[in-house]
Amino acid sequence: MTEFENLTYLHGKPQGAGLLKANPEDFVVVEDLGFEPDGEGEHILVRILKNGCNTRFVADALAKFLKIHAREVSFAGQKDKHAVTEQWLCARVPGKEMPDLSAFQIEGCKVLEYARHKRKLRLGALKGNAFTLVLREVSHRDDVEARLQAINTRGVPNYFGAQRFGIGGSNLQGALRWAQSNAPVRDRNKRSFWLSAARSALFNQIVNERVKKPDFNQVVDGDALQLAGRGSWFVATQEEQAELQRRVDEKELMITAALPGSGEWGTLRDALAFEEAAIADEGELQSLLLREKVEAARRAMLLYPQQLRWNWWDDVTVELRFWLPAGSFATSVVRELINTMGDYAHIAE
């Protein structure tokens, strides 16, 4: 299994180095749900601004303030503790008057707005996130500038970031130990983290092997293609290859890679053979996913940061702004720009 730091670079290994997150204000994330509150219903959507506290801690504090069980407060995704983040929490308060949430105060957290909503906010139910990052002590400015131009055109590999695998790869190591034993794992959080790490590592390995190919973004017979921004996909045939390639080149379609698990992977013929060969040495992790009935899925092979723009504050400091769809990692963009001082594992997804 290829370690995250050794995964193939689309634009070659960066020449420069720099600091990511010298302070929390250098990593700003604004959640984009893709919809507005309904204005009615038994739930309350609460938009918060936080710095120095993690999402679960704030959700539990909100539940305590509202005098409801912690499970009645949900969110679409975890946001980093050591960053400035805006996100939505959702509290189920059936039959209750609208509370005055301006009175909800904890250190490092502020309520920006709140409104009634009809449905629970579920994990993953967001459109994406807008990022503002500041990279400091950057060397080789010309190389970074050229890479920004290239990323704007060609994107980056859509790798799962190092934080998916835990500090020191602990989640992936846990998955491997589990795969090698028949002992049940009863801790639900560990099960979730370890299975997610296993499937993500296999996906990264498939993308890693494909990006090594000079023609990696050429449609192969049997590829599973996805409409940009959509979850559904279809299988490419040789007869359609020229037209499908045109649509891939125009970023209307995305070539996907497998998130292995039980059931059909989605690819056929040449594409399926390639994916199977890419992870042929990872039988233990594949067997674990089958044993635990984790359903196979697809994920775009490339990631195109949207609305990408940048501003050099001076020769060694650059501010980046971009938007990424849900499930994508800002650190997978940054790794194509600079070699960061430190690691990514402490940065929440």
Curated annotation (Swiss-Prot):
GO-annotated biological processes: tRNA pseudouridine synthesis
Active site: 80
Top EC class for this record: isomerase
Entry-linked Pfam families: TruD (PF01142)
PROSITE patterns: TRUD, UPF0024
GO cellular-component term (any): cytosol
InterPro entries: PsdUridine_synth_cat_dom_sf, PsdUridine_synth_TruD, PsdUridine_synth_TruD_CS, PsdUridine_synth_TruD_insert, TruD_catalytic, TruD_insert_sf, TruD_pseudoU_synthase
The protein's role, per its UniProt record: Responsible for synthesis of pseudouridine from uracil-13 in transfer RNAs.
The protein, known as: tRNA pseudouridine synthase D
Lineage, highest ranks first: Bacteria, Pseudomonadati, Pseudomonadota, Gammaproteobacteria, Enterobacterales
